[in-house]
């Protein structure tokens, strides 16, 4: 998990992401009878690991996602579908970034690594198969302006061939999804203060509008 015209010109095509890694645990999803969930807001920060420069985003994180209630082999919620963020950097430059593919359906969300029943909190990761044509990376995060275009992607696939996993946590009570990722620069065009070797750390939260509840699946 976006409609970013500048990025689409660099990474053309819309392809459904695929996930095939076996989950560490299974989960059941419900959304209060809703068939889709929506992001209603949140915040995010993109930090240059070399310079410490931060790009702050707080004007809204949005997505619309279908819910497959009762699925137990990784929940395909597509939580990054139609995902974009409007941002402002330290110099007041307006930016928009998000994934460049427009479609990230069938992303396996919340492969579980832990569940805290008392807190209603699930920890796990988002797993995307990055081997499909025209999908060089998970979230090809894109920053664009009239002055420069940055395309960012995960620097490596640490957990399985052609896969990239983004750690995330979802808390039922606050309906908050928290995620983070390391990203590296792929296709810069003269961006002041940016080097081709720069890496970035992304962290953000998304508030889910519907009463989405994720629980361990019963055997």
Positions of PLM-derived features:
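Short polybasic amphipathic segments
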Residues: 42-46, 124-126, 175
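Secretory targeting and sorting signals
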Residues: 1-19
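Acidic/polar residues at beta-strand termini and the immediately following turn/coil
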Residues: 48, 116, 169-171
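Extracytosolic low-complexity repeat regions of secreted or lipid-anchored proteins
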Residues: 156-194
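Predominantly extracellular/secreted and cell-surface proteins with exposed
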Residues: 58-166
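A detector of low-complexity, intrinsically disordered, Ser/Thr/Gly/Pro/Ala-rich segments
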Residues: 12, 19-21, 26, 140, ...
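Intrinsic-disorder/low-complexity loop/linker signature
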Residues: 52, 92, 134, 162, ...
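N-terminal segment immediately downstream of the Sec signal-peptide cleavage site
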Residues: 18-84, 182-219
């Amino acid at each position: 998990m976006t409609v970013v015209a500048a990025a689409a010109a660099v990474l053309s095509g819309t392809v459904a992401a695929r996930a095939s890694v076996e989950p560490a645990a299974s989960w059941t999803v419900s959304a209060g009878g809703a068939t889709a969930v929506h992001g209603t807001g949140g915040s995010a920060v993109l930090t240059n690991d070399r310079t410490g420069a931060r790009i702050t985003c707080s004007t809204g994180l949005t997505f619309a996602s279908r819910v497959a209630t009762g699925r137990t082999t990784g929940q395909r919620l597509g939580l990054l579908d139609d995902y974009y963020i409007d941002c402002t950097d330290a110099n007041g430059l307006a930016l928009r970034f998000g994934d460049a593919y427009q479609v990230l359906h069938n992303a396996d969300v919340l492969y579980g690594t832990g569940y805290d029943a008392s807190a209603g909190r699930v920890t796990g990761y988002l797993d995307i198969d990055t081997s499909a044509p025209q999908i060089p990376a998970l979230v090809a995060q894109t920053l664009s302006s009239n002055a420069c275009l940055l395309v960012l992607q995960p620097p490596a696939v640490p957990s399985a061939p052609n896969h990239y996993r983004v750690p995330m946590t979802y808390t039922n009570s606050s309906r908050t999804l928290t995620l983070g990722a390391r990203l590296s620069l792929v296709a810069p065009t003269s961006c002041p203060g940016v080097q081709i070797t720069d890496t970035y750390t992304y962290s953000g939260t998304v508030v889910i509008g519907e009463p989405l509840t994720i629980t361990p699946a019963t055997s």
